[in-house]
């Protein structure tokens, strides 16, 4: 039984459920969406903004924080939370995915992965123990193990090799973490691409280890949505009910709907913040491109039904103008709105599960945001 998670209410027609995460006394209601503060900041927002928006759990990236500002800085400041004046809970990924996708060169070894920084070409090595040590210095409440995320389209041989590494490194990470767990938790990462047999093998292997939660990686990395849904559906009946389930890097409205329907509790993605900076915002009527000429004279808010301070204060026409002339305020206003939308969306989703109307909620939002 996970000591950090308490189940709530189950939807009778799917695997959707509510629950409560307890991370060192900070209560987080699930299903939850986590904004991404890759380098220790939610781009264009302050830590006060994040608190005002009601987010009790955010994500940061070990790879980027390891390179800049580095472990020494976090040891000096006693963690990222103190460094960025953030008071709530923090999750960090292990940095493995960024090594494979960003590093100019990388090479697998039995005990880890060597890579060159995408910033200056300097040489580094991640091992299961070193990424735990880095995340201890960051001070995250939930840490991730080092894993091997095979690219979408990999053949069975490559996927099996990734599973072997991922499982071996997960066991090493667990043993190392257990020497000094402190107040931090660590999740393993299920891999296997879009191969159902390998996904179930990975899930079974990792759930046999007494990790406090489980993460699912390697989805929403380029596969068609039917493949994404198929893998979620194959795993859903086998997910341990006592542990929180985290689907990594997933954050579109439709993908979250499919995830929750199949028992996922936690999501993160850069999409709401990145889209906001590019002039795309989410509303109760679907997506809006703020730069469209049709909004030039609009004195309406982004979303008349939205209660955020941006929609209560500024017109769509004004925010469009800020984007068109590339004012930095455009980024902060649009990002604030999108994260308010995501927080409200997840709150309404939890309510729909509690009152037995998840299917109606699912149908409504899927119709608005795409098939």
Swiss-Prot record:
Binds 1 zinc ion per subunit. GO terms for molecular function: metal ion binding; tRNA-guanosine(34) queuine transglycosylase activity. Zn(2+) binds at residues 306, 308, 311, 337. Its cofactor is Zn(2+). It catalyses: 7-aminomethyl-7-carbaguanine + guanosine(34) in tRNA = 7-aminomethyl-7-carbaguanosine(34) in tRNA + guanine. Its EC number is 2.4.2.29. One of its GO terms (biological process) is tRNA-guanine transglycosylation. The active site is at residues 93, 268. Residues 249-255, 273-277 are annotated as: RNA binding. GO terms for cellular component: cytosol. Substrate binds at residues 93-97, 147, 191, 218. Pathway: tRNA modification; tRNA-queuosine biosynthesis. It comes from the Bacteria. It is an enzyme of class 2 (transferase). It holds the Pfam family TGT. Keywords: Glycosyltransferase, Metal-binding, Queuosine biosynthesis, Transferase, tRNA processing, Zinc. Belongs to the queuine tRNA-ribosyltransferase family. Catalyzes the base-exchange of a guanine (G) residue with the queuine precursor 7-aminomethyl-7-deazaguanine (PreQ1) at position 34 (anticodon wobble position) in tRNAs with GU(N) anticodons (tRNA-Asp, -Asn, -His and -Tyr). Catalysis occurs through a double-displacement mechanism. The nucleophile active site attacks the C1' of nucleotide 34 to detach the guanine base from the RNA, forming a covalent enzyme-RNA intermediate. The proton acceptor active site deprotonates the incoming PreQ1, allowing a nucleophilic attack on the C1' of the ribose to form the product. HAMAP family: Q_tRNA_Tgt (MF_00168). Homodimer. Within each dimer, one monomer is responsible for RNA recognition and catalysis, while the other monomer binds to the replacement base PreQ1. This is Queuine tRNA-ribosyltransferase. It comes from Leptospira biflexa serovar Patoc (strain Patoc 1 / ATCC 23582 / Paris).
